[in-house]
């Protein structure tokens, strides 16, 4: 789940306190129970912090002697703080939330606790989770470094009114990627609306299609870059086709221009996690209620957009690790809590038990009464994990830079990909 919004309250460190009834050698034993309080520190980001906060009354009912302190920061600041804490073993929380885009960086090191075996035995619960999400947290050597809590099954959200004006139907968007671009030409001619926010969106999804077993997004299992491959060539070519035909608004996700494009009907489609439908409904473009629908991604593609995990640092306070894991289990393996997070924050459950509920059959008024949650559940079933690499974030920056040179300066695609390949080769083993 890519919930990167909101102003977060900064903080760090682990808070724990214990107290007991005082006695002296000559005093008679007290019959009153000891008041022992443990404080767990949970480091999170919006809107995971709100999900945790909402779960605390139910947690306290089960564990009245365990307090939970939430330390919340903006998404990037949070992960920077966790990187520092793991590298210095100082200021470590008991539980840390990690977004999938950052998990690879953490997984390459030795800072996270392996939860697969005793005393946690997470591997026993593997079948309870969406396969690809559990696999994302599993290293090539079989260590499981985090527990998935929510996922972001990909969807194509589109404006039915704009399609109707262009004489198009959903299948015109989804039959093929080339057909999707061709539909964009008709939409632009008939309505003036752009097909998508940014041509980069096309690249982002297409490089995730057609991966061979064992291949990562940018690197293979031996850290060799995979940029000079047909999927990158096609991704760049179709992104360039979008830009050349002026089908993208050239706006970046979460910018004010992006949200205005949705409000004013200037952007006809958006590929994203299913959670975006909730954001459009609640604050991005509530006035467009009923005009949107959700479809599977074009050409039978399935992809994940975001996802959140809970982890324990290897050097976190050992005395609190059992209770920290109990808290993680409560957040991730409790059907009631998983459904509550979905209903309140559009955090699609990673727990399979929480994917069978009448809530999935409810029509969504924002999507014109469509029972879209069924489609999102189906998409989650088809998504497959690919290995993450510690240089994935760097690789994404390189690819984005080279694509921008193609889109904005007319750089030829073979040269752009060759330059990216060279840079990734230099960085792959660092």
Which ranges hold each PLM region?
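C-terminal lobe and pocket-closing loops
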Residues: 279-287, 300-401, 429
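Short, solvent-exposed loop/beta-turn-alpha elements that line the ligand-binding surface or hinge
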Residues: 116-129, 173-175, 195-196, 215-234, ...
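Extracytoplasmic/periplasmic substrate-binding proteins
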Residues: 236-326
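Short, well-ordered beta-strand elements
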Residues: 35-47, 66-71, 94-95, 145
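Glycine-centered hinge/linker elements that transmit conformational signals in sensory
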Residues: 183-186, 222-252
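Extracytoplasmic/periplasmic solute-binding protein
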Residues: 140-149, 154, 178-225, 267
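Hinge/lid segment of periplasmic solute-binding proteins
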Residues: 100-153, 181, 210, 291-293
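Extracytoplasmic "Venus flytrap"/periplasmic binding protein-like
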Residues: 58-129, 165-167, 261, 265-269, ...
């Amino acid at each position: 789940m890519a919930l990167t919004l909101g102003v977060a309250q900064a903080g760090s460190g682990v808070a724990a306190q214990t107290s007991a009834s005082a006695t002296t050698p000559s005093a008679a034993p007290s019959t009153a129970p000891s008041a022992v309080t443990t404080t767990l520190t949970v480091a999170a980001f919006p809107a995971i912090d709100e999900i945790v906060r909402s779960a605390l009354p139910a947690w306290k009912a089960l564990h009245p002697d365990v307090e939970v302190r939430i330390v919340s920061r903006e998404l990037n600041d949070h992960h920077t703080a966790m990187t520092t804490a793991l590298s210095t073993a100082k200021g470590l929380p008991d539980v840390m939330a990690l977004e999938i885009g950052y998990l690879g960086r953490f997984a390459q090191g030795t800072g996270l606790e392996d939860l697969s075996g005793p005393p946690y035995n997470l591997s026993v619960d593997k079948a309870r989770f969406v396969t690809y999400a559990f696999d994302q947290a599993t290293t090539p050597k079989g260590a499981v470094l985090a527990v998935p809590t929510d996922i972001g099954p990909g969807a194509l959200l589109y404006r039915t009114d704009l399609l109707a004006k262009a004489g198009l139907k959903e299948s015109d968007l989804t039959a093929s990627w080339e057909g999707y671009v061709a539909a964009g030409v008709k939409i632009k001619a008939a309505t003036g609306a752009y097909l998508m926010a940014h041509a980069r969106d096309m690249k982002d999804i297409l490089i995730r299609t057609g991966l061979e077993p064992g291949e990562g997004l940018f690197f293979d299992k031996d850290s060799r870059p995979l940029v000079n491959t047909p999927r990158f060539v096609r991704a760049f070519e179709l992104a360039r086709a979008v830009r050349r035909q002026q089908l993208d608004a050239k706006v970046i996700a979460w910018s004010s221009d992006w949200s205005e494009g949705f409000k004013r009907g200037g952007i006809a489609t958006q590929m994203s996690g299913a959670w975006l439908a909730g954001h459009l409904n609640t604050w991005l473009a509530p006035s467009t209620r009923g005009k949107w629908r959700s479809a599977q991604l074009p050409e039978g593609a399935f992809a994940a957009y975001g996802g959140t995990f809970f982890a324990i640092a290897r050097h976190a306070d050992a005395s609190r690790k059992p209770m920290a894991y109990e808290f993680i289990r409560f957040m991730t393996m409790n059907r009631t809590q998983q459904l509550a997070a979905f209903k309140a924050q559009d955090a699609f459950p990673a727990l399979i038990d929480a994917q069978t509920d009448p809530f999935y059959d409810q029509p969504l008024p924002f999507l014109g009464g469509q029972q879209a949650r069924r489609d999102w559940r189906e998409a989650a079933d088809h998504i497959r994990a690919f290995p993450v690499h510690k240089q994935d974030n760097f690789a994404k920056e390189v690819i984005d830079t080279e694509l921008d040179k193609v889109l904005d300066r007319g750089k030829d695609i073979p040269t752009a990909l060759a330059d990216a390949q060279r840079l990734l080769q230099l960085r792959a083993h660092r």
